[in-house]
């Protein structure tokens, strides 16, 4: 089991697919990593040598923000918006949709389950 960026990536899968198990690396980034390190995308993780795994690990550490660091960075960005008191920060603070969606109906995921109102039933 290869361990990259603190994640055990599956050994039976192809390298680009396995790399997407790391938070912050999607399909495009995974293919770019394979190309940069010189690994054929059709190879499987269990076929890689230790040197190739090390090269992938070093490339990711040098060029990508992944896992805990990425989560912390996103969390700090949201906190910064909330501290500024800008519109987006207020929407985050009130647990409402941030990107302009309507809230008269819908937005149930963000707002939570509907609250019962007394006398509303017909």
From Swiss-Prot:
Pfam families: Ribosomal_S13. Keywords: Ribonucleoprotein, Ribosomal protein, RNA-binding, rRNA-binding, tRNA-binding. The keyword Ribosomal protein applies. Residues 98-122 are annotated as: Disordered. One of its GO terms (biological process) is translation. One of its GO terms (molecular function) is tRNA binding. GO terms for cellular component: cytosol; small ribosomal subunit. The keyword Ribosomal protein applies. Part of the 30S ribosomal subunit. Forms a loose heterodimer with protein S19. Forms two bridges to the 50S subunit in the 70S ribosome. Belongs to the universal ribosomal protein uS13 family. This is Small ribosomal subunit protein uS13. It comes from Roseobacter denitrificans (strain ATCC 33942 / OCh 114) (Erythrobacter sp. (strain OCh 114)).
């Amino acid at each position: 089991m290869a361990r990259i960026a603190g994640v055990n990536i599956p050994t039976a899968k192809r390298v680009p697919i396995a790399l997407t198990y790391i938070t912050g690396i999607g399909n495009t980034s995974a293919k770019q990593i394979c190309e940069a390190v010189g690994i054929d995308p059709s190879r499987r993780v269990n076929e890689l040598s230790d040197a190739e795994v090390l090269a992938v690990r070093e490339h990711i550490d040098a060029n990508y923000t992944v896992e805990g660091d990425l989560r912390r960075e996103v969390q700090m960005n949201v906190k910064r918006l909330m501290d500024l008191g800008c519109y987006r920060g207020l929407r985050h603070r009130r647990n409402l949709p941030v990107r302009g969606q309507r809230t008269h109906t819908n937005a149930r995921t963000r707002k939570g389950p509907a609250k019962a109102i007394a006398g509303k039933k017909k």
